[in-house]
Amino acid sequence: MTEARSDSRRMTISDPQVMRAMAHPARIAIMEYLNSREAGGTATECAEIVGLSPSATSYHLRALAKFGLVEQAPSRGDARERLWRVPSGSVLVEAGRDAGPEARAAEQALVEAHAVRAMERTRDWLRRAGDESAEWYDTALFTDTLVLLTAEELAELNEAVLALLRPYHPRRRQGEPPPGARTVAVQYRTVPLA
């Protein structure tokens, strides 16, 4: 199972303890926020995103740092300000086919936490969709498609989709984003059916 497979700065995680540390909703949001910003962010900035106090957010940042999931970033000039960043570009979470029950349960908890976050985003969009401009309303897309593939074809499909997304990742974009650009959640999953 993956979050993203092709990235030269990919971090691979198979340790159940690390997976459990990552499975907290606030930590998922913190890592996502920091991963979208090349310069990183402060605990206060992260707190605004996750809806916690800066001190509670600092606790979560330290917990993530314990496992190397975040690290202190170079200062923006204010020595009193502590910046954090995600050291790798993407994360591969994979207990492995032969994983024991503890690793399998930790992987499942982490994937389910991400699935809950994805569903929350979808519900949020549906609640406010009528207030969006026609431009954004008309370009939002929901699709659920069953396809017939070999394992090799599925691997090729996954790589092709990830390759299409790669240039749009905030940390990979060159220069300032175009006027009117917004963060868009692209929720892509491929799961072989029984």
PLM regions: where:
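Short alpha-helical segments that sit at the start of domains
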Residues: 2-29
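Amphipathic alpha-helical dimerization/coiled-coil segments
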Residues: 85-147
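Short helix-capping/hinge SLiMs at alpha-helix to coil transitions
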Residues: 24, 35-38
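Glycine-centered, phosphate/nucleic-acid-interacting loop/turn motifs that mediate DNA/RNA or nucleotide
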Residues: 68
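Charged, low-complexity intrinsically disordered regulatory/assembly segments
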Residues: 131-194
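Short, cationic-aromatic polyanion-contact patches
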Residues: 20-24, 42, 75-98
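A short acidic, leucine-rich amphipathic alpha-helix
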Residues: 45-49
